[in-house]
């Protein structure tokens, strides 16, 4: 998986990689040539007292060193550019794919693990790419070239290489084989600690309200300790790599000096050749060390690549059709459900069964029912946040699955049950509700705020009023009104309010509904509500109970003909004659 991921995302940088490899090749060859020049200086210059040879070869050595340094600097620069671009592209690919996920895929992975995979996991692979960029050509050429040059200098001592290099390779392989499962566990534990932190921060009010700080501390401590222990185990194995490598290099160097000294003493080898052989021996083992350091990063990067590939290979449940359809004259807002049935993944029973209804432009359809009856799921099907498992949802006679999702959603103004606001300003959040090509003016923003009865509390600091993440610096009712204003900005063909007035007092609720009727015009309005006072004003009321429609009609007819609706109304102490605003 790691290789496939690297190959896919490194492709745009092939030219940079080719230049990088060329510079590394020249730099490595220059490094391999230096010990030979040094040996010649010792044997032909110093040993014979030939100053001219020393100066001439010294100049050559200086020139080769300069070339090696320049090429090395260029290789580092290109490697950094390649790594930075690779990391940017991989993060973008993750983000672009994740935003296509429906609630099903998001819930399957969980927000904390998606955040970890998009940031920490990408960082681990980027680290591997940057390390690989420095050893991609250097290590193999230095190793092979060093062996060739060492044999050229003194073939009789090459048996030391045949002993030391395999020992080093086998030892490092043994260490890495133990590190891989530990790194896989570490990434899972990082997800866990992020999940605990997210829960604690998101539910800080609940934690304090129930004085559960101690419990949360213990839960975090357990997750933190588990991660720390896994990291310690992996670190212990990783820490073995450098001592093993150093021990092998030092022991091999001592053996080389010993046996080389014996050959010099017997006149079979010159001092310069021993110095050159030592240099090549060090270069060979250094190449193995560089490869080892890269291999130390490889296990964790491999695990991260598996996790990233899992996300990127997960298809979005709500894909776009090959040949999307769209009404010739634009969306007018006729919404029809024909035998719609929906079952959540893994559930035994459908949450909605055989739902059929029609909502027309210029009318308001209220959907009422007890908690858990399936009201929110029903409007999620209309907005195509989920796809039906049977039946169909049609907008202007076209199945919503045949629309391009962006064009469908641009025709719908949704105010969800939980009104989420993005960090920034009020103006930023209102612009978020604009159409793809819509330039939202300040006048339109203030008009939307007026419709949502939100202009009063925004008036003090204006449109630049700061909004914290999630809108936590506003009350529940204020968040709902800002979310309503955001939906109004677009002037969509279909308005969907999923219990979006629950935090408003009766007076503000009535004011917002009156303003919505004025600006909605011929738009279709679908309201999920728990308030009979809201349902009483609707042109059509749909009563949902246990996933089925048990009543359809006006407020008055349902009071007479639908026991479920009558009980619902009675529970709110509303008389059978109510027809106006409650």
Swiss-Prot record:
The keyword Acetylation does not apply. Keywords: ATP-binding, Cell membrane, Membrane, Nucleotide-binding, Transmembrane, Transmembrane helix, Transport. Its main location: membrane. Pfam families: ABC_membrane, ABC_tran. One of its GO terms (biological process) is transmembrane transport. Residues 17-300 form the ABC transmembrane type-1 domain. InterPro entries: AAA+_ATPase (IPR003593), ABC1_TM_dom (IPR011527), ABC1_TM_sf (IPR036640), ABC_transporter-like_ATP-bd (IPR003439), ABC_transporter-like_CS (IPR017871), P-loop_NTPase (IPR027417), Type_1_exporter (IPR039421). ATP binds at residues 369-376. Belongs to the ABC transporter superfamily. This is Uncharacterized ABC transporter ATP-binding protein Rv1273c. It comes from Mycobacterium tuberculosis (strain ATCC 25618 / H37Rv). The lineage of its organism: Bacteria, Bacillati, Actinomycetota, Actinomycetes, Mycobacteriales.
